[in-house]
């Protein structure tokens, strides 16, 4: 892929700031004081060839931001609470971002001629759904689009799934939860459409291939992290799409025990903070979904953090086998690396699916790097 990168000012500013080791938990960032900010005046552009097309979807309607003049805004640690919605701060960390780049490039090299590798960095809600009138007043966070552009611009031999502009064009829709850090199924569906367009062989239809279910009363990570702030006491609804071809998933748990489970589980009676676990049984080292309507040997592997949970069900109609690997926990059950997993299972598509906060967490990227060999 031929690329043009106007990044001297970006890297210069990054190096002057220094490389922070500010860490996050498994998913959410909690330290915003020492991480590196991507300067707002930096420019990173890319050009794509036919062999490495970056799929995009154009907005079909003009999107306007709501009037936020009377909406209360409160900063609470690493969270910004705006009305009844919380947003997570993100800060770019150069050293960790560069290791992510190296890791993804190595995955492409290891699987060259054997499988297609896709990189998917998922932005968080702050730079997507937070109205510009509020977002523009926040100076101690990084520009997620520029951070993603920086990482994608240095990835070669891997297909990059562009999500930022697409999600931004749908920002007035219910694509992120209000009181949890994850995206919703609708946000994940728009990501699936981008992947399918890039792959050139996706055919799933939301109306024909899935059954919609809803589970009310979800109070997620932001609600808990805010010490149950009253402003967030407005539960989300978890909307899920159950594949019509099968709702069965075979899971290997972290203790090595197998579990027959559902791709979409009825969580109506589950605890309020557990309802995101409707998707693929939550976070497990290894899972396999077999589509009984396919007999062509097609197989994909999704290497994911928890954002991949809501995305995975949309892959099911397109493949005979969908293999799900959580890179944070896989080594608990196996010492196999990426090349061995792909060879053993005749996998032809590999999706590396991470939310952007993971790309600033050295522990998570170390785990991803350890596997991608």
What are these regions (language model features)?
Residues 1-17:
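Sec-dependent bacterial lipoprotein signal peptides
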Residues 14, 19-373:
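Extracellular glycan-modifying ectodomains
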């Amino acid at each position: 892929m031929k690329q043009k990168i106007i990044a001297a000012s970006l890297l210069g500013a990054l190096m002057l700031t220094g490389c922070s080791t500010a860490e996050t938990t498994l998913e959410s960032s909690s330290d915003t004081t020492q991480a590196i900010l991507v300067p707002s005046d930096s420019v990173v552009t890319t050009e794509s060839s036919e062999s490495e097309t970056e799929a995009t979807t154009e907005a079909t309607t003009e999107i306007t931001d709501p009037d936020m003049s009377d909406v209360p805004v409160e900063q609470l640690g690493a969270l910004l609470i705006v009305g009844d919605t919380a947003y997570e701060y993100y800060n770019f960390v150069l050293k960790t971002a560069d290791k992510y780049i190296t890791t993804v490039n190595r995955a492409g090299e290891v699987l060259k001629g054997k499988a297609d590798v896709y990189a998917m960095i998922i932005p968080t809600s702050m730079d997507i759904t937070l109205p510009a009138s509020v977002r523009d007043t926040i100076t101690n966070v990084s520009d997620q689009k520029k951070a993603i552009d920086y990482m994608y611009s240095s990835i070669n031999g891997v297909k990059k799934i562009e999500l930022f502009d697409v999600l931004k064009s749908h920002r007035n829709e219910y694509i992120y939860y209000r009181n949890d850090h994850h995206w919703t199924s609708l946000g994940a569906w728009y990501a699936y459409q981008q992947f399918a367009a890039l792959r050139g062989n996706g055919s799933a239809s939301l109306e024909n291939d899935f059954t919609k279910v809803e589970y009310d009363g979800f109070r997620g990570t932001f609600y808990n992290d805010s010490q149950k702030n009253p402003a967030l006491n407005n539960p989300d609804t978890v909307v899920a799409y159950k594949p019509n071809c099968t709702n069965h998933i075979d899971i290997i748990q972290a203790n090595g025990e197998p579990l027959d489970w559902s791709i979409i589980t009825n969580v109506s009676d589950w605890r309020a903070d557990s309802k995101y676990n409707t998707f693929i049984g939550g976070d497990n080292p290894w899972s396999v979904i077999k589509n009984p309507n396919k007999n062509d040997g097609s197989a994909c592997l999704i290497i994911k953090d928890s954002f991949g949970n809501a995305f995975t069900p949309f892959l099911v109609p397109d493949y005979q086998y969908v293999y799900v690997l959580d890179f944070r926990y896989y080594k608990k059950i196996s010492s196999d690396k990426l090349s061995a997993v792909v060879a053993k299972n005749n996998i032809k598509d590999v999706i590396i699916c991470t939310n952007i906060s993971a790309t600033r967490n050295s522990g998570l990227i170390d785990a991803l790097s350890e596997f991608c060999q």
